[in-house]
């Protein structure tokens, strides 16, 4: 942590030096993440003196491809979500290496290992993570407790519990089962997505002939309904939302598909890449160094050395106010019965509020560090749950072939992709 703080100081000194002669400095950014970047861009402008012009791009890969073809010098930095085409950009070698930035190189050592490949092309640091949002499962445990159930740890247990909840008619009004439809099609989509991500996250070659795959696709087809009754739902028992602004134990692993491996934690990453033809590359790198050293609560999703609990400022202010009132009453010489009652009430109130002092406790952060071993980021690779696989799923569910034939068809499809990308 001390080394990281020294990096922040180094970056601040660099920023001050840059600002001294940055009166006419500019930075031109093309992004499809404008509003997510807005506050950080404004802060950087104020501290650096660099003027930022931002092009809001609807189709960021079209913007990048056009800039590549014409060698556009008027865009210095591309900021976009990795799944929008980082894979393609790396194949094009369309980036400015960041290897000369000591600040970024040092900060990179603290990026969670599962996220480091996003920033690199082979061993070259070629981009910087601006934001990361992991997706996990959130479970309304109060309902499960009431029904004598526990949070499912495996995909089999998830199917078992969903089947039982429906069979027993346990769902309260205005409460759904899952965010996606609990149908053959809906659960095949969920299963296929996590089977692929978890296989790739572990570095395995996709194998749809695996017994685990055959077991689940057969079970989903045999046990789940083809359609779901319409239902007005304001909440769901099982949800897969994005994480909040800081680590929390409310976000859990999606139930395991493979017996000895946690499911992949799908993570949406905003990445920044410096245009090799940009005329303000130094300013672009300066901005990335600023992002790497000016941390937010969301930085806990990126850097593994951030372990201090994150306090809730408004709750801390209320606790401080209560502490003052308690101290005054404790110091009062001649306390009356009413004073003793008030003091006891304030102390109980303080104890209850103390459990909400932190947005993220040390336990929350430790829990996320375990989840972070399974982070998976799609970079727009062709190895995904693509249209062709979705068509095969529908054909399988419509009875075009059995589970084994379906698995072979899926395998034939991905083998063609492996051949195309030379793997």
Give the location of each predicted region.
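Short, well-ordered beta-strand elements
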Residues: 23-34, 50-55, 77
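Hinge/lid segment of periplasmic solute-binding proteins
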Residues: 81-136, 251-258
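Short, polar/charged alpha-helical segment
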Residues: 33-51, 389
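Extracytoplasmic/periplasmic substrate-recognition and gating elements
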Residues: 124, 246-324, 328-331, 337
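C-terminal capping/gating helix-and-loop segments adjacent to ligand/active sites or protein-protein/ligand interfaces
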Residues: 36, 120, 326-420
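Extracytoplasmic "Venus flytrap"/periplasmic binding protein-like
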Residues: 47-111, 142-153, 231, 241-246
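Extracytoplasmic/periplasmic solute-binding protein
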Residues: 124-130, 135, 159-206
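Glycine-centered hinge/linker elements that transmit conformational signals in sensory
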Residues: 191-194, 199-229, 247-258
């Amino acid at each position: 942590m001390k080394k990281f703080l020294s990096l922040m100081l180094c970056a601040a000194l660099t920023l001050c030096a840059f600002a001294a002669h940055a009166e006419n400095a500019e930075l031109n950014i093309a992004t499809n993440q404008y509003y997510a970047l807005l506050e950080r861009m404004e802060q950087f402008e104020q501290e650096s003196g660099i003027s930022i012009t931002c092009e809001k791009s609807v189709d960021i890969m079209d913007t990048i491809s056009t800039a590549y073809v014409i060698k556009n010098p008027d865009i210095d930095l591309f900021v976009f979500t990795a799944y929008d085409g980082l894979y393609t950009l790396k194949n094009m070698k369309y980036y400015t290496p960041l290897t000369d930035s000591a600040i970024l190189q040092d900060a990179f050592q603290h990026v969670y290992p599962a996220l480091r490949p996003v920033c690199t092309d082979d061993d070259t640091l070629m981009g910087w993570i601006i934001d990361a949002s992991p997706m996990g499962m959130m479970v309304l445990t109060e309902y499960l407790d009431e029904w004598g159930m526990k949070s499912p740890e495996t995909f089999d247990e998830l199917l078992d519990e969903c089947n039982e909840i429906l069979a027993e008619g346990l769902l309260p009004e205005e409460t759904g089962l899952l965010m996606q439809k609990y149908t053959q099609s809906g659960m095949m989509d969920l299963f296929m997505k996590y089977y692929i991500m978890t296989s790739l996250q572990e570095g395995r070659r996709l194998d749809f002939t695996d017994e685990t795959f055959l077991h689940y696709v057969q079970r989903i087809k045999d046990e789940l309904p083809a359609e779901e009754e319409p239902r007005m739902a304001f909440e769901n028992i099982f949800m897969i939302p994005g994480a909040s602004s800081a680590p929390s134990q409310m976000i859990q692993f999606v139930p395991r598909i493979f017996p000895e491996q946690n499911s992949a934690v799908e993570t949406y990453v905003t990445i920044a890449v410096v245009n090799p033809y940009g005329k303000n590359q130094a300013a672009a790198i300066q901005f990335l160094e600023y992002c790497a050293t000016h941390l937010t609560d969301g930085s806990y999703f990126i850097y593994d050395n951030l372990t201090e609990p994150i306090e809730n400022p408004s709750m801390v202010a209320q606790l401080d106010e209560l502490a003052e009132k308690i101290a005054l009453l404790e110091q009062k010489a001649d306390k009356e019965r009413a004073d003793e009652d008030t003091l006891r009430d304030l102390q109980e109130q303080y104890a209850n509020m103390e459990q909400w002092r932190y947005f993220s406790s040390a336990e929350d952060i430790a829990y996320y560090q375990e989840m972070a071993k399974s982070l998976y980021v799609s970079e727009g690779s062709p190895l995904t749950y693509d249209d062709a696989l979705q068509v095969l799923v529908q054909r399988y569910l419509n009875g075009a072939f059995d589970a084994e034939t379906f698995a072979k068809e899926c395998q034939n499809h991905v083998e063609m992709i492996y051949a195309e990308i030379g793997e």
